[in-house]
Amino acid sequence: MEAIRSGERAALHRLYDRYSDYAMAIGLRYIPERDEVRDVLQDSFVRIFTSIGQFNYNGEGSLKSWIGRIVSNRAVDYLREHQHFMTVDDIPDEPDEPEEPDIGDILPDTLTEMIGRLPTNYRTVFNLYVFEQWPHRKIAQLMGIKESTSSSIFFRARRMLAKQIREYLKSQET
């Protein structure tokens, strides 16, 4: 950790090699285009390298979480800067569906693809709430929306995702 903090090039390279795939996976949760995610990762690692001195290392898990937060925040910033967010009213409501489908037989990559097909703001709220475990209050502040809007977007995202899952499972039956 000291070599990284002192800016030793080989140590920074090892840090990048160790966490770049993890960072890419997080970026792809928010932004489905790999080229755009690469831009976000470049910005993220610049931020990681320049602020590593202020990071309080408490083991491997704390470093990984810190890197994940930086990538998530930078991805949301990127989406906001490029105006990828839609208003909630721009997306029609999905009809009510009976119950949540069972996702046990769906491969993680397939589920990630489905999440990637959600509208940008739906995908962002869903990822922050489910994977990052942020409260709606914090999501609302980050995205510049009301807390109730974050809750509504999450509910709609969950419904849209459930519909995609049901359609996928139905297609697998035949």
Could you say what each language-model-derived stretch is?
Residues 5-13, 24-43, 147, 169-174:
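Short, charged helix-capping/linker segments at alpha-helix termini
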Residues 5-6, 29-32, 45-60, 81:
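Sigma70-family region 2
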Residues 19, 40, 153-156, 160:
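Residues within the DNA-recognition helix of helix-turn-helix
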Residues 25, 39-46, 61-73:
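Structural recognition of an alpha-helix C-terminal capping motif at a helix-to-coil junction
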Residues 54-58, 68-89:
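Arg/Lys-rich amphipathic alpha helix in sigma70-family domain 2
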Residues 84-108:
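Internal acidic/polar
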Residues 125-129:
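A short pre-motif secondary-structure segment
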Residues 141-146, 159-174:
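C-terminal edge and immediately downstream basic/flexible tail or linker adjoining helix-turn-helix-like DNA-binding
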